[in-house]
Amino acid sequence: LQYMFLGVEAIDAEGLKMHRKRISLGRNFEALEFARSLGITVAINLIADPDWDRERFEVVRQWCLDIPEIVNISVNTPYPGTESWVTESRKMHTRDYRLFDIQHAVMPTKMPLHEFYAELVKTQQVLNKKHLGWAALKGTAKIAAGHLMRGQTNFIKMLWKFNSVYNPELQMADHRRPVVYEMSPPPEKKDKVDAKQLYILPAKGRQGRNIDDATET
């Protein structure tokens, strides 16, 4: 085992409780330290909640800069079959299927939406500064040279693609696109969930699907 993706999700106890991790903050960091001691390269995932403000984003950015690991930032997104799908009290402001990709906010944000995306991308820029561009090229020079000798340029181009992919204006534009497929609404909020029913999606036939007979056949 050389690489590990670790779902830390939050760097504070309140965030862990929100994401129902059922683990202490100390235990999370113990797992990270143990992986480091084994020489495993760790990629960390954190979840940005729509309720974050500028100060919260700044705290997370500084933490990401202070550690050597790659940190990925995703957006808190309830999915059918998960616990948060039935316990989340915040109403979704969109059910556009395309936006349920953990890079778009489908629940109301505390900040104006465009400001939330600007802070999100600014935080994700830490990944770009630390691990892409020239920083990545230094560690992959032999690999890059081999690709170039074979006329393959995709790897090199990828190292500088961050700004064309992570762009708050593109995220806002996604919200303005006409909705083609809409997610079925979640059930009424429940305080307690039967764990046996999680991650099990019963067949609902054509319910909630905007597909006609001609398209389906």
Q: At which residue positions do the language-model features occur?
A:
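Short, glycine-/aromatic-enriched active-site segment of Class I SAM-dependent methyltransferases
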Residues: 16-18
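Alpha-helix N-cap/helix-start and coil->helix boundary motif
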Residues: 12-13, 113
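Radical SAM enzyme core and accessory elements
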Residues: 83-97, 101-217
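Conserved C-terminal portion of the radical SAM core fold
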Residues: 1-12, 21-84, 122-148
